[in-house]
Structure formats: structure tokens, C-alpha cells
Regions:
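Conserved short alpha-helical segments that host acidic/polar catalytic motifs at enzyme active sites
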Residues: 1-124
Length: 124
């Protein structure tokens, strides 16, 4: 579920059941994005880590919580899932001076690397 505002782009892929956080937003992705922003005290990666940890504790069941976010200069990734790694595991590839992240490798391209479960990363 993608979401954007004037400052950044946010992508959520997953399923959370019984989330108990207080956050503004019209859709789930916007609520999670605003929750992460509320944790940001100048270190976006630390804010993402803290927010994801709290959301996991305040959620009855996390089937998957894959997050990508970027402000145009910094891109961040968090990947967590409890089941079905063939579906929820993310992949990355470096090509043409860019880092690519997606849910499934492109067909016919063999240089995609699997992103481990419970990964938190700054994407160069």
C-alpha cells in the first residue's frame, strides 16, 4: 500500500491484525507512516527501528510488515514476516549505480539477492 506526502514516499506490504497504535491517517499505510515520523528525532533509521518494534509489540499478529520509505535522499527498508517467505521475502539488486528493491525478482535476472527476515537497512 503506497502513500506519499510533500516530504516522502512510503510503501507498506504486509498484513497486521489487531494493531493498537494511536496515529492519524485515512489508510493503514498513512497511520504507520505518521507513527514512524513521530519517532523521528533526527535519525530516520532509528525512528523506523523504534516504530517497527513498538508496532510489533502492539499488534495481535504480524503476518508481514515490509516497509520502504524515502525522502529523495535517504531510503530505508524494514522487512519482517511470520509466515510464507516465498511470498513476503523481499529482494535487492545493484545495477547501473542504483539499488533496486522489490517483492519478487524480475524474470530472467539472476543477480537478485534475498533480503533476510527481520532486516532493517539504509539503502545506498
Amino acid at each position: 500500500m503506497p502513500f506519499s506526502d510533500d516530504d516522502s514516499v512510503f510503501i507498506f506490504n504486509g498484513e497486521l491484525r489487531g494493531v493498537k497504535i494511536k496515529s492519524e491517517g485515512r489508510i493503514g499505510a498513512e497511520k504507520i507512516y505518521n507513527y514512524i515520523r513521530r519517532m523521528d528525532k533526527g535519525d530516520k533509521l532509528q525512528a523506523l527501528d523504534k516504530a517497527v518494534s513498538i508496532i510489533k509489540r502492539r499488534t495481535e499478529y504480524v503476518r508481514a510488515m515490509n516497509i520502504l520509505m524515502s525522502d529523495g535522499e535517504t531510503s530505508l527498508l524494514s522487512s519482517d514476516y511470520s509466515e510464507d517467505p516465498d511470498y513476503f521475502q523481499m529482494h535487492r539488486r545493484r545495477s547501473g549505480g542504483m539499488e533496486w528493491v522489490c517483492s519478487q525478482p524480475y524474470p530472467g535476472e539472476n543477480d537478485w539477492q534475498r533480503i533476510a527476515n527481520a532486516t532493517l537497512a539504509l539503502i545506498p
